[in-house]
Swiss-Prot record:
[CaMn4O5] cluster binds at E355. Pfam families: PSII. The chain crosses the membrane at residues 57-81, 122-143, 166-188, 243-263, 279-300, 435-459. Its main location: plastid. This is Photosystem II CP43 reaction center protein. It comes from Lotus japonicus. The lineage of its organism: Eukaryota, Viridiplantae, Streptophyta, Embryophyta, Tracheophyta. It is found in: Plastid, Chloroplast thylakoid membrane. Residues 1-2 form a propeptide. Belongs to the PsbB/PsbC family. PsbC subfamily. The keyword Transmembrane applies. InterPro entries: PS_antenna-like, PS_II_antenna-like_sf, PSII_PsbC, PSII_PsbC_sf.
Length: 461
């Protein structure tokens, strides 16, 4: 038996001679060492969860309840607030203790994962096939691979149902559309109609359609999670019980690198969808926590100046702008009354502070004259001055504006980071898919190891 002290552990499976991969090729050294690969993955999970817990506590320590979350550069607390923890009417934070608990739970979990990762990387068996056949595998074993796929799908389905249970039974989640400016509520009347749920998938991705990103009520979102959770769990059971069909055995490449490329492609798609969701959707990502969307900030500016000039005596229904179109109000291509000026391009925006002022034909002139509430004015003025502008290097504001306030919206951060991550994951997919296909066809070249520069360098040790 191999132990820490009998010397064999030192290098096998870790150096270029025994694996064909140098240290910097990462987990490629562990392709055939299922026990060590398990250690690498568990340790990686520990690092992820440690970051989540530490960053969570960092945000709690720096949090100022009097300022909106999006003014404080927070990226984790908005997610917890969206799940209904610690917030009350209007998205006001009334209790930060749940956030503290979340951070501590993640830190404790990361310690457990870290221990498990180090154990399996250093002490545990190099391969699992002999001692723990249930957890062992061979990459070419198609039946085992689809069983593992099935287990993963079931875990994803359980994750979807956790959100359903939180929203429906355990305290509810934050609904930005609740009357009077948002509140936490239980989602009980779920949308389970397949025509509505799958109708989102059939929508055009453009304009007022917006594909699944256009979802704007929580009943649809939570009902969608019921459908997704059910499909994932049933699909998982199916993949555990069945073997791949002949067409799948022929069509797919069955190697570790191929599975890596499939996973990277899936994560890339998730990243691009998340980018669009966080940028455009103010229901799943409430503006109270993440700041307004771009269209929302633009429409808020038009609304704010309509309110101001109407108080100063302007007739907002008939005033002409410099182009001859309406200065404050105009008509959309389909005839609705919309805000005039540059914000006309964002006429499809729907936001909780604006919808009460719409009638059957768009913005209702009589409501704009008589029904505007103070909370709508306050909120739009706040959103107008917090547009999601800014760049990845945290320089906020319009690029051409010399007096811009250095503010970067969490929406900018989350959307750009997920776009960039989605892009790099896609490049990784192409790279590994190409290598996997070449290996399967038997013509991979790789780098000529005989003339690699590193071979002529002095060893580091």
């Amino acid at each position: 038996m191999e132990t820490l002290f009998n010397g064999t552990l030192a290098l096998t499976g870790r150096d270029q001679e025994t694996t064909g991969f140098a240290w910097w090729a990462g987990n490629a050294r562990l392709i055939n060492l299922s026990g060590k690969l398990l250690g690498a993955h568990v340790a990686h999970a520990g690092l992820i969860v440690f970051w989540a817990g530490a960053m969570n506590l960092f945000e709690v320590a720096h949090f100022v309840p009097e300022k909106p979350m999006y003014e404080q550069g927070l990226i984790l607390l908005p997610h917890l607030a969206t799940l209904g923890w610690g917030v009350g009417p209007g998205g006001e934070v009334i209790d930060t203790f749940p956030y503290f608990v979340s951070g501590v739970l993640h830190l404790i979990s990361s310690a457990v994962l870290g221990f498990g990762g180090i154990y399996h990387a250093l002490l545990g068996p190099e391969t699992l096939e002999e001692s723990f056949p249930f957890f062992g595998y061979v990459w070419k074993d198609r039946n085992k691979m689809t069983t593992i796929l099935g287990i993963h799908l079931i875990l994803l389905g359980i994750g979807a149902f956790l959100l359903v249970f939180k929203a429906s039974y355990f305290g509810g989640i934050y609904d930005t559309w609740a009357p009077g400016g948002g509140d936490v509520r239980k989602i009980t009347n779920l949308t389970l109609s397949p025509s509505i749920i799958f109708g989102y998938l059939l929508k055009s991705p453009f304009g007022g359609e917006g594909w699944i990103v256009s979802v704007d009520d929580l009943e649809d979102i939570i009902g969608g999670h019921v459908w997704l959770g059910s499909i994932c769990i049933l699909g998982g059971i199916w993949h555990i019980l069945t073997k791949p069909f002949a067409w799948a055995r022929r069509a797919l490449v069955w190697s570790g690198e191929a599975y890596l490329s499939y996973s990277l492609a899936a994560l890339s798609v998730f990243g691009f969808i998340a980018c669009c969701f966080v940028w455009f959707n103010n229901t799943a990502y409430p503006s109270e926590f993440y700041g307004p969307t771009g269209p929302e900030a633009s429409q808020a500016q038009a609304f704010t100046f309509l309110v101001r000039d109407q108080r100063l005596g302007a007739n907002v229904g008939s005033a002409q702008g410099p182009t001859g179109l309406g200065k404050y109000l105009m008509r959309s291509p389909t005839g609705e009354v919309i805000f005039g000026g540059e914000t006309m391009r964002f006429w499809d925006l729907r936001a909780p502070w604006l919808e009460p002022l719409r009638g059957p034909n768009g913005l209702d002139l009589s409501r704009l004259k008589k029904d505007i509430q103070p909370w709508q004015e306050r909120r739009s003025a706040e959103y107008m001055t917090h547009a999601p502008l800014g760049s990845l290097n945290s320089v906020g504001g319009v690029a051409t504006e010399i007096n811009a306030v250095n503010y970067v919206s969490p929406r900018s951060w989350l959307a750009t980071s997920h776009f960039v991550l989605g892009f790099f994951l896609f490049v990784g997919h192409l790279w590994h898919a190409g290598r996997a296909r070449a290996a399967a066809a038997g013509f991979e070249k790789g780098i000529d190891r005989d003339f690699e520069p590193v071979l002529s360098m002095t060893p580091l040790n």
